[in-house]
Each structure stands twice: as structure tokens, then as C-alpha cells.
Amino acid sequence: MKQDIKSMTLAELQDAFAALGEPKFRAKQVFTWLHRGVVGFEVMTNLSKTLREKLDSLYFITAPTVARKQISKLDGTIKYLWKLRDGNCVESVVMQYHHGNTVCISSEVGCPMGCKFCASTIGGLVRRLEPSELLDQVLFSQLDSGLPISNIVLMGIGEPLDNFDNVMRFLELVNSPDGMNIGMRHISLSTCGLVDKIEKLAERDLQLTLSVSLHSPDDESRSKIMPVNRRWPVDTLLAACRDYFAKTGRRISFEYTMIDGVSDSPEQAQLLAKKLAGMGAHVNMIPLNNVTESGLHTSSKQAIHRFQTILEENGITATLRRTLGSDIDASRGQLRRKYESN
């Protein structure tokens, strides 16, 4: 069975090439070709024909195809639906900011977490993405859009920490000086709160930004919209976050979806401020995107402003997320589901 060569690190490639009797620099040449987005060994013209044929007999190169592409008329945001090698689909979104271009990528096909307000979880988890499939979303978004990618957010379909090992390998690949060379400080990873994996991530001491999907400061309301809270309640999660902050020195961003009558009361704002005190935390307030199946609605502008004011009066930095691409199915998972239902 052929192996996925793009999921291999440079060191692994060098070992594989040594086993073939090839010098290490050949492995580096191939690594560079792969991270430029080539889709076949035949284009690697600085390799001998014999070596190219040998590699083709041992390995395959992942390369997603564009199943659908949407460009926002409002702000130029580009949303991709990628068709993978096995026919499954995932989404990526390219967003343009004054400080550079950011790609939001998926970590899984579907999602096992069951958050009530998120379209990605409808239908559950299909499978986890390979490191190469994570990398391809960055690489091919850049190649197709013509926009140099400077920042990555793992906030698309799936729970990144549920795919821990493959995500860690992807980070190593995309951070490689011989590859795309995107710095860890330019990468954000979002989790709904897998405490054991947050603890594991803290041990790695990576300089990325950890974003925690909190969405409520109390167990009663959080458990209703996020089943993960029944496994790891709010206080258990926040204890892990404090430990992460202490070990890494990296400020955590807390994602907080504003849901009418569920997460937007003044009392919840006060409780949230109390629980986040002393963490150097930042709260990223997010107006709820419409997901018909959820039966939930976004908070009013007045409720959002009131909530933000209470946080800031209590010393918590809070910002309202700028909504991009609202005219091209802004909610996670919507594009994939619409495509697959056709």
C-alpha cells in the first residue's frame, strides 16, 4: 500500500531516502516540491526519472479539488469546499485583513462534539483529517486565491484536539523553514474544552494562541448547548486553562457566542468576569450565526453591548468579532451540508 508522503516530516523523508540509498539533500528537494503544491512526482525535474518512478511506486501525493468556491461581494472573503481523495468534503475560508491574510481550516470531516449552535456537528464525525489534508487546505487556498497566507486558525469543521496527533504533526509541517514557514505565533487553535488534551498541549509549550469555546460561565446553560461540559464542567475547564497560562505564558482567548436568552444575561457577564479574573484572558464575543436546526437566535445589539460593558468594567478585555463573508454561508459546516444534499 502506498504511503502518504506529504504527511511525512523532513527528518522522516531523509530516513526513507537513506533506506533507498539516496542522499539527504534529495529528501529536502522533494519536501520543498511537496510544500509548493505539486500534485505528481513527474514534475520534480531535479530528480532522476528512475527516482521519480520509484517514489511514485511507494507514495501518493494528496491534492484536494475545489468542489465549490464562493467569494463574498461584501468583503472578498473566499470560502472553499474541498473534495478529498476519498470523496469526503471539508471547508476552508480565506479572510483578508489589514495585517495579512488568514485561512480558517477544518481538522475533521464532521464533528463529534454535538454543540447545539454549530452546523458542523450535524451528522456527527465521519473521520479525522490526515496531516497532509490539513496542510493542503493552507497550501491550496493560497495557490488558488493568489493571496499569500500569513495566519492560520484551526476553527473550521471539527475539534482540533480530538485529532491531536495529526494536528501536532501538521503544525510541525507548516512551521518548517523548508516548507511554508508560518510561525507558531501566527497560528490559533480552537477547542470546545477537551481538558486532557489542553493539559497535553501545555506540555508542548508551543507559541500558538489557544482559543477556548466557552459560550457560558455556568454549567447549567453550558451543558444544554455543549455536551462536552458534562464531561468537563466549567470550573474544571478553567482550572486547566489557568494551568496552561501558567506553563506557557500565552494568553488564552475565550470564544463566547451571544445567544438570546441562553448566554447573554448581565448575571452571566458578571460571573464570567469573576471566573476569568487574573488570567490575562481575552473574550471574543461572537453574534450567533443562523443554524436553522438549532432553534437558537442571536442576542440583540443592546444585550451584546451591555454584556461587553460589564466585562470591561470588571477588567476583562472583550471584543466583538467582525463578521466576514456573511453573504456566503457564514456558519461552519453549512457549505459542506448543502453540497452533499444536492
Report the location of each language-model feature.
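Short linear Ser/Thr-Pro motifs
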Residues: S72, S106-S107, S120, S190, ...
